[in-house]
């Protein structure tokens, strides 16, 4: 392996940003913003949170081809990683200034923080081929993934006593400090920028041209098009469940902040378990069948959530959702690889990542608007099941998913 220190620092960055993913994006801050800052009596908190997630992810998705070009062609990866990380860290620290009724200020800070987080990942991911030989990249990526889970768990455990004491401002400061401190090794040790002479605007334009070229290649593969459309649909449902599950549990079922953290930890453990248990069936049954099975599970979870009233039942349901989460992520990636021409892995996975980011745009808006219009989160969570059902039937029409992709006629 090229440089173990660089590999470790790269993995540690995943550990760092997982504090944002867990505490800010998934568990504690969504409930705080929706119920304390906005007030969620008539679904307005859901509406504003859904808008914030959708708008920020739409911005990141639309800018990703340009950011990818800047990462690949300008030679300024580390500089932009630092800029986007600083943007996120500072915005999260500013959460501590929010007070009840500061809806717009909170909305703007969420936009900035999420753009900083998701935009920075474009440059973070671009370092992987530079720090690791191809034969080790899968392992290094998995190490980052595993260390990231550890970061999620540790940051939630650190947040727990603060949340229990109602010291939310200090919770946001803790997350920003956690992110900043553990991202420093990556900022210091990752390879230095090697400017190419191409301007930032020039490299962004080249990234867009490259993206258009890849999209043209994809348009010539009808099975891949259908899979990506299916993935866009069901992944939107998955992302919506992730960003609204804590708000649903707190508002509809009366979960306390401590219970929400426990709920998230259960989901993390079951997600890892699901990915591990289904690793062999993905190969034996084919990734398409495993994804279809996962979507049936996700649809059942969303429909069941509509009827659930007891906290214990929701804990059990969340365990099944976690199993489906780990499985659908692993199987979807395995299925996508079957459509990639040899030697085109990097550019095709860039498109896969873009579709993944785009799949957090519509679902949160749908949940927020239905919740506010019906003054209930139950019809909103029921509507999310439609994303899984649509993805299921779209995937059924895809010719592939076994040992090899079968081409029609």
Task: Label the model's feature ranges.
Residues 178-189, 382-409:
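Multi-pass alpha-helical transporter architecture, strongest
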Residues 1-7, 193-229:
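Juxtamembrane intracellular "pre-TM" segments in multi-pass secondary transporters
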Residues 139-159, 353-363:
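Glycine-rich segments within core transmembrane alpha-helices of 12-TM secondary carriers
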Residues 91, 102-120, 313-327:
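Hydrophobic core of transmembrane alpha-helices in multi-pass small-molecule transporters
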Residues 62-76, 273-287, 371:
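Helix-to-loop junctions at the C-terminal end of transmembrane segments
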Residues 22-46, 243-260:
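Short amphipathic helix-loop junctions that connect adjacent transmembrane helices
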Residues 42-46, 161-177, 369-388:
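A membrane-interface helix-boundary motif in multi-pass transporters
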Residues 79-94, 289-304:
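Structural signature of the two symmetry-related core transmembrane helices
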């Amino acid at each position: 392996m090229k440089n173990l220190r660089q590999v470790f620092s790269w993995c540690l960055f995943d550990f760092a940003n997982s504090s944002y993913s867990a505490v800010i994006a998934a568990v504690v801050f969504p409930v705080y913003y929706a119920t304390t800052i906005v007030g969620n009596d008539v679904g307005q908190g859901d509406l504003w949170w859904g808008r914030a997630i959708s708008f920020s992810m739409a911005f990141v998705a639309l800018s990703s081809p340009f950011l990818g070009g800047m990462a690949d062609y300008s030679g300024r990866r580390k500089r932009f990683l630092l800029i986007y990380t600083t943007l996120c860290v500072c915005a999260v620290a500013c959460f501590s200034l929010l007070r009840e009724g500061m809806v717009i200020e909170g909305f703007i800070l969420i936009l900035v923080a999420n753009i900083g987080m998701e935009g920075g990942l474009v440059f973070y991911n671009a370092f992987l081929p530079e720090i690791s030989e191809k034969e080790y990249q899968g392992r290094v990526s998995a190490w980052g993934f595993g260390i990231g889970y550890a970061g999620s768990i540790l940051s939630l455990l650190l947040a727990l006593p603060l949340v229990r004491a109602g010291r939310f401002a200090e919770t946001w400061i803790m997350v920003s400090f956690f992110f900043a401190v553990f991202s420093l090794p990556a900022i210091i040790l990752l390879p230095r920028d090697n400017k190419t002479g191409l301007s930032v605007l020039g490299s962004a334009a080249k990234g867009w041209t490259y993206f258009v070229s890849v999209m043209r290649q994809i348009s010539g593969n009808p099975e891949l098009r259908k899979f990506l459309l299916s993935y866009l649909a069901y992944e939107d449902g998955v992302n919506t469940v992730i960003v609204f599950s804590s708000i649903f549990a707190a508002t509809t079922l009366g979960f306390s902040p401590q219970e929400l953290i426990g709920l998230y930890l259960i989901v993390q453990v079951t997600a890892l378990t699901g990915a591990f248990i289904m690793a062999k069936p993905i190969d034996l049954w084919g990734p398409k069948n495993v994804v279809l099975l996962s979507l049936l599970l996700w649809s059942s979870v969303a429909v069941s959530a509509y009827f659930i009233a007891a906290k214990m039942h929701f804990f059990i349901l969340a365990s099944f959702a976690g199993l489906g989460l780990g499985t659908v992520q692993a199987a979807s990636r395995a299925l996508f690889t079957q459509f990639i021409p040899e030697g085109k892995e990097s550019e095709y996975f860039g498109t896969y990542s873009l579709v993944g980011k785009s799949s957090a745009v519509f679902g949160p808006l749908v949940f927020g608007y239905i919740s506010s219009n019906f003054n209930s989160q139950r019809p909103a969570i029921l509507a999310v099941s439609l994303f899984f059902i649509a993805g299921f039937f779209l995937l059924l029409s895809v010719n592939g998913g076994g040992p090899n992709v079968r081409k029609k006629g």
